[in-house]
Amino acid sequence: YNAEKTHLLGAYTSQTNPDGKSFATEFVAGDDIILEYEPPVSDEKARIAINQIGYGYNHLHVTTDLRSTGPGTSGSCMVNINCEEGEEWQNEKNGVCMMVEKIGKVGYLCSGSLVNNTAKDMKPYILSAFHCTQDYDNGKIASETDLNQWVFYFHFEHTGCENTSPVAGHKTMTGCRRIVSIPIEGGSDGLLLLLNDKIPAEYNVYFNGWDRSETATSSGVNIHHPSGDYMKISTFGNHPIKTTTWLDNLSRTGAPNAHWNVIFDKTTNGHSITEGGSSGSPLFNENKQIVGTLTGGNSTCRLTSGNNLYGKFSYHWDKYSQADTGRMDIWLDPLNTGATTIPGLSQTGEEGSLINYKSPTNVTAQSISSNNVLIQWNAPVYTQLISSVSGSTQ
């Protein structure tokens, strides 16, 4: 806790860190922190070693209460997840997390998402981007000790649309192990992690569904944490999504046609794009299934028409390697069903819909007598076959 005792973390017990290995906490507000240890009844001496202290500044949001201290540090064009743009994505947002990472002596920020699997057993897999495990300066890969100290933030969001609206009470998980790594060079920049512990039921998270087909979606969103800011949503649909090959200024070339290129739309409350910290975040199709993970791009609030490249989930699936650590199919389809798509799953076991339901249009109401109103509408048009007709009722 901090010196003012206004920000408290814990208590941490053997249940929090059952293996007694490396562990980390989320950030504490303030310049002074106090670590309090309560020994067991026995005379056993404590074995505690503080390996490193990370000092966050400028871009890290740590407040001593549940209210934001001001606008976020991401670009001014960003749209908060609880604006109207996110109304139809309230389940999916509960699976998206901010990742605070330790790689050697350096800290990084990325985004990721819980993902469902065909066993529907709520195994806490996190889907993200491989480059999130690399030190940008020297390419060093996060070690097992590093991964045990990664912290995953869920529900890190404003409760309203404005940056001045209250902040939700976030939940964190600490530690993971690497399951699948697919690099940028010659690959699709995919990463599958498994959290060290099962997520408590009261966390109210969501295991997002996926679509491993090669079909380019006509519309969708990206939910992410740009610059480590509170959760944002970026929307696309006015510009066709295109297949492309990754090539960056470090001369790294991805596998041919292993990325989606997305240009985001201006919406009611802004023109969200992506930034550093958005890396690894999920790209959702119109049916609310993950089809990609962010590698990077050149879009900014000044260049909203810039490119945003996502490693294809279809490539992550089984196209990079036959090794268990280079493909996601054996982990996310453990029953070997051959499923192409799968819906999301809540912690209560409720599955998401594979249909993105739309509102009727041209709704009119006409009073035809003192006790009757004629309501008419046009039903929405779907790309999937469902029961839907135009009509009227009294």
Regions found by a protein language model. Name each.
Residues I126, I141-D146, E162-G175, V180-P183, ...:
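C-terminal subregion of chymotrypsin/trypsin-like serine protease catalytic domains
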Residues F27-F264, G276:
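Serine endopeptidase catalytic core focused on the charge-relay Asp
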Residues Y1-K5:
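Short, surface-exposed beta-strand/strand-loop-strand elements in extracellular ectodomains
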Residues E350-T383:
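Pro/Thr/Ser/Gly-rich low-complexity, intrinsically disordered linker/stalk tracts
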Residues S113-P124, H271-L294:
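Catalytic nucleophile loop of clan PA
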Residues A379-Q394:
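Extracellular low-complexity, O-glycosylation-prone stalks/linkers
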